[in-house]
A protein has these predicted regions:
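Short, glycine/charge-rich beta-strand/loop segments that flank catalytic centers
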Residues: 1-5
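Helix-start/capping segments and mature chain N-termini
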Residues: 7-216
Length: 216
């Protein structure tokens, strides 16, 4: 939080850095039940060269109108597209996003700097690779996802984040098109990741990746 005693527009020279710890329940009211996601075509969350890669309060301001649209239509979150072509997938409002297409787990790459490099995202990529899954971090268009849904190779989609951990996606809505995934049921990859991550966090599974640090 900026603390300069100044009224105007400039970067602050002093700040308060605070960490808040609080017990929480499931991020979504229905827990691990797959959610419905609205694909936003009109508004964008951020653009290349901006602050999309940062956990900054200002990034949320740009997402509010799109999220209000989704709320009114009964959808849990917004799938944001790139700010130039409105073609490539960035992320979901509160999560990074993954797709399982033809056995490969795909998540949008971070190269353009407009996607938050989430810790849970990175953890999932590491766990998947360590367990023999094929993982690709690359540009992924909505059209490619639609084609995979059409030909039956899109078998799963899920979001990842600190609050939600793993959130299965049961349906994407793009205008009049409804892309129902895995009969709106949680898929095996999402379930595996949730079990692995929470198992390591709670000490119920062996930490083979060296994440756990003993605090004296």
């Amino acid at each position: 939080i900026a603390t300069d005693a100044f009224l105007g527009v400039h970067a602050s020279h002093s700040y308060i850095f605070a960490i808040i710890l609080s017990p929480v329940g499931s991020y979504y009211a229905n827990g691990m039940d797959p959610v419905k996601i609205y694909i936003e075509r009109e508004y964008v969350r951020c653009v290349k060269g901006g602050t999309g890669m940062a956990k900054a309060g200002g990034n949320y301001a740009a997402s509010l109108i799109g999220q209000e649209k989704a709320d009114k239509m009964g959808y849990a979150q917004v799938l944001w597209l790139d700010g130039v072509e409105r073609k490539y997938i960035d992320e979901v409002g509160a999560m990074n996003v993954f797709f399982v297409i033809d056995g490969t787990v795909i998540t949008p790459s971070l190269e353009d700097g407009n996607i938050l490099p989430g810790v849970t995202r990175a953890s999932c990529v590491e766990v998947l690779k360590a367990n023999g899954y094929k993982v690709e971090e690359r540009k992924l268009s909505v059209d490619e996802v639609k084609e995979a849904h059409k030909n039956g190779t899109l078998t799963e989609s899920f979001g990842t984040g600190t609050a939600a951990v793993i959130s299965p996606v049961g349906e994407y809505i793009d205008g009049d098109e409804h892309l129902v995934i895995n009969d709106s049921k949680i898929g095996p990859v999402a379930q595996f990741l949730y079990d692995e991550l929470t198992g390591i966090q709670w000490g119920k599974k062996e930490d083979k990746l060296g994440w756990i640090v003993k605090v004296n």
